[in-house]
């Protein structure tokens, strides 16, 4: 089945095999010593006999990834954002470093140094696969551990397909993912949120911030709302909001590659030759579709906003283009995410007295506030926030404000140091009696959760929601 031929100072192993299409082929591998050649001959014959022979293939990592992306995108119905981010990751963080390597030649000991290289790589070193000239300050801003972890996750999935395609026997990705150096997000407490809200004069921004603070809505979910999603008479007159869509700006190339059923509507371009489009799409996950309850002040603001939109249309009906969205510009066109972000940044620059947080930080602040108010009712708060799992919510809650911890310290101080220890006797060993059950309060559980690390919180979630 295989033979060895001496050629000069080397030894060649020759064998016959069939490629993936069943076509007969000849294999030829060269070794420095006869012992190596004999060992390879035995291995090849065994693999050909039991059907585990790996057909030689010259496919590179770059070729494999660009073959995998459309398959994965179609199979898992990627959103335009996920498609764009994945392509950018391949173009800028993988191909420039290991893209030309053959898939069959790559080993785990090649991937580890690759991760180390990325950890010392500046952000934006490559854009669309082209190396960029960076300033000295730009060179100091290195890729985050989160970005490197995302590269690992993508490669792990892609190489699992390579195994299924019989390109390789096992994935070269390391078993242990690169560690993520998590930093606590900056959030506001309830007093700061209310104080900040009271300083916002832009009506559209005020309403959007109000909804994010009270309902923990994502930016795209807020802008994706339509008047028909509001039911002011529901819940005995309290009013409800149905969240089932999201507004997003998406790359046109990505839109042409993904499942079109994910997109409900594509808005007309405002600029000729634009490379992106404003779209109305499905929400992030199934759990993101939810019914939320209005507070009385929010209900009043929503009614006032609807009245304002009517006035805008009546003031200039010939120039008004009703886009159908709840959040509109005075001309009726939709408020895009980048516009809302611009307004928020302008307001933030005018009010440096508030600790700097991004718009999405309002959602995290809201989730933390709701958990504190509910006494740690994770399921109820998860229903409000639309987090995919309670684990994600727990990780958000892990950085809760210092106030409860400070209050706990004050209680310990008041109790511990005020004890009367005069004449106190040494504690006697406990008798072998059944211990009296201790009443565990919600606050005790919350404090225990705050002290947990990420792994302990994930295990707790698995037990609670299995």
Question: Model regions: which residues?
Answer:
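N-terminal DNA-binding recognition helix of tyrosine site-specific recombinases/integrases
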Residues: 1, 89, 93, 101-109, ...
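N-terminal DNA-binding module of tyrosine recombinases/phage integrases
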Residues: 7-12, 17-112, 128, 307-322, ...
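Flexible interdomain linker/hinge and immediately adjacent N-terminus
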Residues: 113-114, 163-197, 330-331
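Short, basic (Lys/Arg/His-rich) helix/loop patches that form interaction surfaces
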Residues: 124-127, 198, 202-205, 215, ...
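Long, amphipathic, Lys/Arg-enriched alpha-helical "connector/arm" segment
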Residues: 128-134, 179-205, 214-217, 225, ...
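Catalytic-site neighborhood detector that most strongly recognizes the C-terminal catalytic loop/helix
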Residues: 179-180, 187, 238, 245-249, ...
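Short, polar N-cap/turn motifs at the start of nucleic acid-interacting alpha helices
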Residues: 229-237, 375-398, 425
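C-terminal secondary-structure termini that scaffold catalytic or DNA-interacting sites
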Residues: 233-235, 245-289, 298, 410-466
């Amino acid at each position: 089945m295989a033979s060895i031929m001496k050629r000069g100072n080397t030894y060649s192993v020759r064998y016959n095999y069939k490629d993936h299409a069943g076509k007969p082929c000849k294999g030829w591998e060269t070794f420095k010593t006869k012992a190596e050649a004999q060992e390879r001959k035995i291995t090849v014959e065994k693999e050909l006999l039991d059907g585990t022979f790996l057909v030689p293939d010259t496919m590179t990592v770059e070729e494999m990834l660009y073959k995998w992306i459309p398959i994965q995108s179609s199979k898992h119905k990627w959103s335009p954002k996920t498609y764009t981010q994945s392509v950018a990751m391949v173009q800028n963080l993988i191909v420039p470093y290991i893209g030309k390597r053959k898939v069959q030649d790559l080993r785990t000991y090649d991937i580890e140094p690759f991760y180390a290289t990325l950890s010392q790589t500046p952000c934006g070193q490559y854009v669309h696969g082209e190396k960029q000239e960076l300033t000295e300050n730009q060179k100091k801003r290195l890729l985050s551990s989160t970005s490197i972890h995302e590269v690992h996750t993508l490669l792990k999935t892609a190489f699992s397909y390579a195994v299924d395609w019989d390109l390789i026997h096992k994935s070269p990705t390391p078993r242990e993912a690169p560690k993520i150096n998590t930093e606590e997000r900056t959030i506001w407490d309830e007093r700061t949120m209310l104080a900040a809200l009271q300083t916002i004069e832009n009506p559209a921004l005020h309403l959007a911030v109000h909804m994010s603070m009270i309902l923990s809505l994502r930016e795209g979910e807020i802008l994706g709302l339509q008047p028909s999603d509001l039911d002011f008479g529901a819940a005995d007159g309290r009013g409800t909001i149905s969240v089932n869509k999201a507004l997003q700006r998406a790359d046109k190339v990505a839109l042409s590659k993904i499942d079109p059923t994910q997109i409900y509507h594509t808005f007309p371009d405002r600029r000729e030759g634009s490379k992106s489009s404003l779209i109305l799409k499905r929400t992030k996950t199934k759990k993101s579709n939810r019914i939320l309850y209005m507070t009385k002040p929010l209900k009043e603001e929503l009614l006032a906003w609807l009245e304002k939109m009517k006035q805008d249309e009546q003031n200039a009906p010939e120039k008004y283009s009703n886009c159908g969205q709840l959040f509109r510009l005075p001309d009726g066109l939709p408020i895009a995410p980048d516009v809302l972000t611009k307004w928020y940044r302008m307001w933030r620059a005018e009010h440096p007295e508030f600790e700097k947080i991004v718009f999405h930080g309002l959602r995290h602040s809201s989730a933390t506030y709701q958990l504190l108010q509910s006494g740690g009712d994770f399921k109820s708060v998860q229903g409000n926030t639309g987090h995919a799992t309670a684990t994600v919510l727990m990780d958000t809650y892990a950085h809760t404000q210092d106030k409860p911890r400070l209050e706990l310290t004050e209680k310990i101080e008041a109790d511990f140091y005020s004890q009367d220890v005069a004449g106190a006797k040494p504690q006697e060993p406990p008798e072998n009696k059944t211990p009296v059950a201790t009443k565990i309060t919600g606050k005790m559980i919350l404090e225990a959760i705050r002290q947990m690390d990420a792994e302990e919180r994930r295990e707790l979630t698995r037990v609670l929601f299995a």
